[in-house]
Every structure is written in structure tokens, then in C-alpha cells.
Amino acid sequence: MASKNPQNALVMQSGGCTPVLNQSLSGVVSTAAASKYISTVYGSIHGLEGIIEGQFVDLTALSDRKWNKIRRAPGAALGSTRRKFLTEDAPRVISVFSEWDIRYLFTIGGNDSAGTALELSHVSKSMGYPLTVMNIPKTIDNDLVLTDHSPGYGSTARFIALAALGAGHDALSMGRAAPITIIEVMGRDAGWLAAASALAKQKNSDAPHVICVPEI
């Protein structure tokens, strides 16, 4: 149950960066800041590392001009991390949350970030600390369960489709000198990005001619 008095929220970014990672950050902050239940929205520097070290920045204090730059910036404005939550981190994390009066946590990330969000939710409940946790999907792999398309996938899919089409034209131009081009894309155990390489095809002769996905 939400407190009658406004309390603070914390946002963290983690995992690999996507072209729209900072767009999600901006959306979370602007929406949270407009809530009557939230007083201040903080950002954790380098994700979970920043939480453990208590390194936060006040995101509600940033000007609209600053946010316009952040939304269009590549990378992760808050800094990202690959560090996973460990059981021994629990006392320190809850202590920091209590010190900063953090009652709402927004994690922006993919599989590992969603796992961290779930762990923090369980830990806060087991330790009797009131914390609402929400994960904002972020993965170019597009492999989050029950998520039709994750922010970051569309931009990367477009890039790969154009790259495949361009590589095909290059190979055609080179003729016998370099008739075959092999492109390896990211995606972990999902073939969504590989499949996206065909999005720019207009006729059968256009590249790619063979697509290999892990599901098949």
C-alpha cells in the first residue's frame, strides 16, 4: 500500500546498451516525477554498483534542455553494469534504501536485470522493507517472456536489415572475388535479430539468401 506522504524512487540501468535506453530512462523519470506518491527520483550510477555504494544523482533536478540531450544520447546516461545481485548484498542494499527513503525501484534492463528486480523484491519482503519494484524491458535480443517486442529491438533490427542488404550489394559487385558474405549477429539464444536481416528484402535475389536461427 502506498504511503500518504510522498517518498523517493530510484532508477537504474543495467546490461548492454540499446539505441533507446535513455528514452526509457526519460519516460520513467517524467512519469514518476508527476506521481503524487513520489517526491524525488534518483538515478543509481552504474546500476547495482551504485546502489551498494550509495552513489545516486537527483534526476528530478535536471532541466528540460538537459533531458532533451539525454534522450538522444547513445549509451547509458547513468552508466550500466553486468554485476548480479548476491545474497550477501541484501543488508547493504536495504540499508541504503532506508537511508535514502527509497520505496520505489525501477530497473531498466533485460533478462539479468529482470532477475535482479525479482531478487530485490523478494529480499525487501523477507526483510520487512516496503518496496515496489518494476522492470522496464530493454534488450536488443527481444527474448523476454510475454514481451512482444522490447525497446531496443526495433532499432537494432533495422540496422541489421540494412547492413545485410548492403553487404549483399557489395558481394554482387565483387563477383567471383568475394561472392559470399557471412554476417554474425547478436541475439543470445533467440533468432529474432537474425530473422530481422530479411526485413529489407524486396525480391528473392536480395540478400540475405540463408538465415540460420538457433530455434531451428
Task: For the regions a language model picked out, list residue spans one by one.
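Short beta-strand elements in bilobed, periplasmic/extracellular small-molecule ligand-binding domains
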Residues: 41, 72-80, 205-213
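Solvent-exposed alpha-helices and their adjacent loops that cap or buttress functional pockets
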Residues: 1-5, 10, 34-36, 68-72, ...
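Short glycine-rich or small-residue beta-strand-to-loop segments that form or flank ligand, phosphate
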Residues: 8-18, 76-80, 103-109, 135, ...
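Glycine-rich oxoanion-binding loops at beta->alpha junctions
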Residues: 1-2, 51-103, 112-113, 140, ...
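N-terminal phosphate-binding or glycine-rich loops at protein starts, especially the Walker A/P-loop
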Residues: 2-55
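Short glycine/serine/threonine-rich phosphate/pyrophosphate-binding segments
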Residues: 18-28, 51-52, 86-91, 111-119, ...
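Short, ordered loop/turn segments at secondary-structure junctions
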Residues: 14-16, 44-49, 82-83, 110-111, ...
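Accessory alpha-helical/coil subdomains and C-terminal extensions
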Residues: 96, 107-109, 116-130, 134, ...
